[in-house]
Amino acid sequence: MKARFRIPMSEDKAYAYLLAAIMAEVEYRHRVFCSNEDMEKQLQEMAHWLTTPSSHFGILLCGGCGNGKSTMLKAFQQLLNALHIPKPYNEGTYGIRIVDAKYIAYLCKNNYEADRKLISVDMLGIDDLGTEPSEVMDYGNIYTPVIDLLTKRYEEQLFTIITTNLTPQQIREHYGDRIADRLNEMVKKIVFSNGTYRTDQLATPG
C-alpha cells in the first residue's frame, strides 16, 4: 500500500503555518492581506487534509477567478520549502513543483523528455486546469497532454494539487467521464465560493 504524504504536525499548527505562508505570499505581491470566513474555512479544510489520514492523494482547489486558489497553492509550496520534511531513504526533502496547465501542453509538443519527467514527479501542482489546449499535434500525432498526465498520476497515486476555475460538471464535460471519475477518487475538493480579491481594497489574489 502506497503511503500518503502528510505534514508531521497537528492540524492547528498546520493551519497557523499555512496562514503565515499565505500572508507572506500576499505581502510578496505588494497587496494588503484581509482575512474572512471563507478563507478561514478553506485553510481549515486544507490543514485537516494535510494532517489526517485520507484515501485521497491530491487536492482540487476549485472556484471563480481571483479568489485565492493559486495563492493557497503557492503558500503550500513555500511552507514545504521552509519545513524541510525529509523523504524516506535519505532522498532529500519534500518539495512541490508548480506548473501552469498550458505549460504541460507546451512540454508535450516541444520537450518530450522533460514532459516524461514532469508526469512522474512525486509532488506536482497544476495551476489553472482547463486553460490549456485539449489536444496538441506533433508530426501528425495527436496527444492529450493533461489527460495523459492525470492518468499516469492516478495510476501511480502521486501527490497532486490542482487549481481550476471549472466546476465539477465542466471538468466532466471538458475531460470526459473517465478522468472526472478518476479525479473524484484522487482528490479532496476544496471549494472557493468567495468573490475575487483582485480589487483595489482586498488582497490574496488567486
Positions of predicted regions on the chain:
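Hydrophobic anchor at the beta1->P-loop junction of P-loop NTPases
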Residues: 61
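Hydrophobic positions on the alpha1 helix immediately C-terminal to the Walker A/P-loop
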Residues: 72, 76
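A short, basic N-terminal segment
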Residues: 1-55, 190, 194, 199-206
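Walker A (P-loop) ATP-phosphate-binding motif of ABC ATPase nucleotide-binding domains
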Residues: 58
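Walker A/P-loop NTP-binding motif
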Residues: 78-81
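Conserved glycine(s) of the Walker
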Residues: 66-69
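Conserved nucleotide-sensing/catalytic segment adjacent to the nucleotide-binding pocket
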Residues: 88-155
